[in-house]
Amino acid sequence: MEARAQARYIRVTPMKARRVVDLIRGMDATEAQAVLRFAPQAASVPVGKVLDSAIANAAHNYDHTDADSLFISEAYVDEGPTLKRFRPRAQGRAYRIRKRTSHITVVVSSKEGTR
């Protein structure tokens, strides 16, 4: 049994979001929630929301209400589209600002069947 959740077009750079996702990959779901709650990175907030959504999807789709028996089987961050902006500089120049976005995916599975 596995349940997945995805957040798309999140305004966090993929490199910074991957640092957070690498922390929780393979952890128990409740332990990962605690780690994300106290992680100092800004990307831990959207990753935590995706994890909560994956746990809720498992409860809804499979009547699997016990979050203690779930673990994170897959977690990855893909790069979304980049918003391009310009910052005016001296003597008529302009520097490009790239505002990167991320697609965050978390898959939770039950422990008894997979591990």
UniProtKB/Swiss-Prot annotation:
Gene3D superfamilies: Ribosomal protein L22/L17. The keyword Transcription does not apply. PROSITE patterns: RIBOSOMAL_L22. InterPro entries: Ribosomal_uL22, Ribosomal_uL22_bac/chlpt-type, Ribosomal_uL22_bac/org-type, Ribosomal_uL22_CS, Ribosomal_uL22_sf. It comes from the Bacteria. CDD domains: Ribosomal_L22 (cd00336). GO terms for molecular function: rRNA binding; structural constituent of ribosome. The keyword Ribonucleoprotein applies. Keywords: Ribonucleoprotein, Ribosomal protein, RNA-binding, rRNA-binding. GO terms for biological process: translation. Belongs to the universal ribosomal protein uL22 family. This protein binds specifically to 23S rRNA; its binding is stimulated by other ribosomal proteins, e.g. L4, L17, and L20. It is important during the early stages of 50S assembly. It makes multiple contacts with different domains of the 23S rRNA in the assembled 50S subunit and ribosome. The globular domain of the protein is located near the polypeptide exit tunnel on the outside of the subunit, while an extended beta-hairpin is found that lines the wall of the exit tunnel in the center of the 70S ribosome. This is Large ribosomal subunit protein uL22. It comes from Streptomyces avermitilis (strain ATCC 31267 / DSM 46492 / JCM 5070 / NBRC 14893 / NCIMB 12804 / NRRL 8165 / MA-4680). The lineage of its organism: Bacteria, Bacillati, Actinomycetota, Actinomycetes, Kitasatosporales.
